[in-house]
């Protein structure tokens, strides 16, 4: 019986270890010599406690944790209409008992009216709506160089007549210089550039525990 219990404990430990590796992949500590600086969002966050939610119903942009600060998951749902904050997809209303609190971005937004744009040319991070507040789409384009704010991909210049206004994040950014990092170890949300302002890549790593706000994949310094 004792051997059986030990075997179960070992199996449980291996499952937890495998789960940790699933969330994180190894990054080298080498400096990418092309990278000179990064432009990163300067975000405030709020801690939301006493939650009854689950990973599916949790809000996109929020990270959910257990009582001891262990990362559980990222939220998967987002609002689809300015008029009602319903989930985009069907999720159960059951509470995930592992989740104790969430860390969510505290974002200001701006309403942009009188638009002539389309879903392809619309800005990433913006949500576009019809005149009556019905959700149309998320913008798909982002700037690819600090020097010129061109679209990342080829989009038509035609107006999507369904789109009347957009809700866009009002973000502050910070410029981080003197970096020794690489694309894998760079922070998610940051864009990395060469000395002449040419876009190199987006960072790929994010923190997974509130108690330990280090990079998920590496200890390469980014700030």
UniProtKB/Swiss-Prot annotation:
SUPFAM superfamilies documented for this protein: Plant proteinase inhibitors (SSF100897)
The disulfides recorded in the entry are 27-120, 31-116, 40-126, 52-95, 55-73, 56-91, 62-104, 119-137
Any idea which UniProt keywords this protein has?
Answer: Disulfide bond, Protease inhibitor, Repeat, Serine protease inhibitor, Signal
Briefly describe its induction.
Answer: By auxin.
- sequence repeats, residue ranges: 24-81, 88-145, 152-209
As given in the record, the signal peptide range reads: 1-24
Keyword Disulfide bond listed? The answer is yes
**UniProt key word Signal:** yes
Record-given protein name? Proteinase inhibitor type-2 TR8
Q: What broad taxonomic lineage does this protein's source fall under?
A: Eukaryota, Viridiplantae, Streptophyta, Embryophyta, Tracheophyta
> Which Gene3D superfamilies does the entry link to?
3.30.60.30
| Residues at the site labelled Reactive bond for trypsin | 29-30, 93-94, 157-158
Q: Which family does it belong to?
A: Belongs to the protease inhibitor I20 (potato type II proteinase inhibitor) family.
Instruction: Classify the source by domain of life.
Output: Eukaryota
**One MF term from GO for this chain?**
serine-type endopeptidase inhibitor activity
């Amino acid at each position: 019986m004792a051997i059986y219990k030990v075997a179960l404990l070992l199996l449980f430990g291996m499952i937890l270890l495998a789960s940790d590796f699933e969330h994180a992949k190894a990054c080298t500590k080498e400096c990418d010599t092309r990278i000179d600086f990064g432009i990163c969002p300067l975000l405030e966050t709020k801690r939301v406690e006493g939650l009854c939610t689950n990973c599916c119903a949790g809000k996109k942009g929020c990270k959910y944790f257990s009582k001891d600060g262990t990362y559980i998951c990222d939220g998967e749902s987002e609002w689809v209409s300015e008029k009602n904050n319903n989930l985009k997809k069907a999720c159960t209303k059951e509470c995930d008992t592992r989740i104790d609190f969430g860390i969510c971005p505290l974002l200001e937004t701006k309403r942009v009216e009188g638009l002539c744009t389309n879903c392809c040319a619309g800005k990433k991070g913006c949500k576009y709506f019809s005149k009556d507040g019905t959700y149309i789409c998320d913008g798909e384009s982002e700037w690819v160089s600090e020097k010129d704010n061109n679209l990342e991909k080829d989009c038509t210049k035609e107006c999507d007549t369904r789109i009347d206004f957009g809700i866009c994040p009002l973000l502050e950014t910070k410029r981080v210089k003197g970096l020794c990092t690489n694309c894998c170890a760079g922070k998610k949300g940051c864009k990395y550039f060469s000395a002449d302002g040419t876009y190199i890549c987006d960072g790929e790593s994010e923190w997974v525990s509130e108690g330990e706000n280090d990079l998920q994949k590496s200890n390469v310094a980014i700030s």
